Amino acid sequence: MERPAAGEIDANKCDHLSRGEEGTGDLETSPVGSLADLPFAAVDIQDDCGLPDVPQGNVPQGNPKRSKENRGDRNDHVKKRKKAKKDYQPNYFLSIPITNKKITAGIKVLQNSILRQDNRLTKAMVGDGSFHITLLVMQLLNEDEVNIGTDALLELKPFVEEILEGKHLTLPFHGIGTFQGQVGFVKLADGDHVSALLEIAETAKRTFQEKGILAGESRTFKPHLTFMKLSKAPMLWKKGVRKIEPGLYEQFIDHRFGEEILYQIDLCSMLKKKQSNGYYHCESSIVIGEKDRKEPEDAELVRLSKRLVENAVLKAVQQYLEETQNKKQPGEGNSVKAEEGDRNGDGSDNNRK
């Protein structure tokens, strides 16, 4: 699925990626649905989101009226579940950012190679800063649900670390694939890392669903790194571009792009304004492994900046107080002298008298 990538350990930590704004066009001209323009590949919004069924306990036979009421309650609940699944349209996702420069540089070479063969595909390319793996998609409808999602992400952290057993999870990327010729992606190579990532994805889905969040897809989770999708450029359909031709990327079929180490998972918005570097808006992030024991550089810079500002403010306040005191002191001296003058004047008058 497509993505946005890593977020802030507060909201600004996702700045390590850049991406251009995805254009929105007349989606009726595209073979892919409107959801295809979001950072995941053709999500099936009719999936089973894991909503619990109403218990089907035995109803006492001696109370047919109550039995009828129970059946009515169950029917209402089923209708609500069906409506919830029908209205399910993910707008947030968990992202694993791709920050290895070897991987991102290799993807740029791939994209440029494709564009040299067909420059009509320019707008179908994913921006430099948006390369990622989408771990989970979800629907968060308001600020309260976003806060619940943030809590769920924090709860996910120890589960992920337990799955990894203190080891790094290395994700090697090798070769090219497509989803029905509409979405082009770099493949995640086979290996034990795949089962670990699948377990993390399933754990994330369960963690968010247990908090009442609509999350996940009906299709099997297939981790991938999207580099282009035709739905980003609906006009291509009118120009006769129906699919991504294999010949465009054939020389990269067996290319090894590099390895990414999982160190961060971000909760990102698909719809909020992207960051200045092109990366998706991040609500929160968790860091995994050694980098969690060492404070991130960005966070350290923020901390240092705050200290510098606090010191500057404190110094300014102290300077102001000193200047204020200095201004008062001459005035106080003049008052004393004036009082002494008054007393002396009174004495002179008395002498005259």
From Swiss-Prot:
Cell membrane recorded as keyword: yes
Tissue: Expressed highly in the heart, and moderately in brain, lung, liver, kidney and testis. Hardly detectable in spleen and skeletal muscle. In kidney, isoform Delta is expressed in the principal cells of the IMCD.
Region (RII-binding) location: 301-314
Entry's Gene Ontology molecular function annotations: AMP binding; protein domain specific binding; protein kinase A binding; protein kinase A regulatory subunit binding; protein kinase binding
Annotated residues for binding of AMP: T134, H224, L225, T226
Residues reported in the UniProt entry to bind CMP: T134, H224, L225, T226
UniProt key word Metal-binding: no
Entry's Gene Ontology cellular component terms: apical plasma membrane; cytosol; exocytic vesicle; hippocampal mossy fiber to CA3 synapse; lateral plasma membrane; nucleus; protein-containing complex; sarcoplasmic reticulum
Protein name in the entry: A-kinase anchor protein 7 isoforms delta and gamma
